[in-house]
């Protein structure tokens, strides 16, 4: 067994960060921006590239307002037009690809049409794969200027291999998401120890990590940054908004929106190899308000960390307070 796995397993609810002496008069002085690729974004948060979280309209709004996004890959025939549309608007294009044979043809098509996205994400449930490594090498050969994220992975070995293949960033998290049941269906994943997995991966990472899944509270963003994340991918907390895809459903006077995992029956259209589920999330109003609240809470986190920017969070001490009730799913 790798020595990394002798470390104690913990997750977000098991960790509390330890405050340092504050040096700012107000949290408003704290800067939450993060450089990712060649661009700087307002906060280290990106909505999950799931069909129930992001669509073209929301992608445009996010890009226009200084937020990072990754468009999902579940309407593959629309991706080239999406890149063209974003570029015509003077915005950056960020897309997802898979690893099947026709994706190689798609990459060739983009090169032929000179539709090179600024960001590309290889989106695979089990990213520590020879096929993912082959796709990384192909994309970096054909589109060397695209900032390439690959995932998802759970181990330091996987991070090393994807980085060595040419990935510019790696996405960490296998099945910890609220709409994901990978750990229940397969016995594998980072559900219940996602934060520890992030910590282990950060020990070897030379390039940025995206923490993907398991975020239940705004404070979890700061915890992700503390344990090595440059960016935090969030699904359920950024679903259910006015701008979010999904049908609006009213039950007993309360308003909800549909939310489903990328490997769910809803997504696949059939009950086969299902590792996701469908659920209802409360209607939350405008996503702008939620993102602003995340920014303000992160500013408070920076203040507690005794700094002025995100770097200060990476240096704070922490304590492990085992919470057996709230560990994992709740």
Curated annotation (Swiss-Prot):
InterPro entries: Aldolase_TIM, GMP_reductase, GuaC_type_2, IMP_DH/GMP_Rdtase_CS, IMP_DH_GMPRt. GO terms for cellular component: cytosol; GMP reductase complex. NADP(+) binds at residues 209-232. GO terms for biological process: purine nucleotide metabolic process. It comes from the Bacteria. It holds the Pfam family IMPDH. Gene3D superfamilies: Aldolase class I. The active site is at residue 180. Its EC number is 1.7.1.7. Keywords: NADP, Oxidoreductase. It is an enzyme of class 1 (oxidoreductase). It catalyses: IMP + NH4(+) + NADP(+) = GMP + NADPH + 2 H(+). One of its GO terms (molecular function) is GMP reductase activity. Coiled coil: none annotated. HAMAP family: GMP_reduct_type2. Catalyzes the irreversible NADPH-dependent deamination of GMP to IMP. It functions in the conversion of nucleobase, nucleoside and nucleotide derivatives of G to A nucleotides, and in maintaining the intracellular balance of A and G nucleotides. Belongs to the IMPDH/GMPR family. GuaC type 2 subfamily. This is GMP reductase. The gene is guaC.
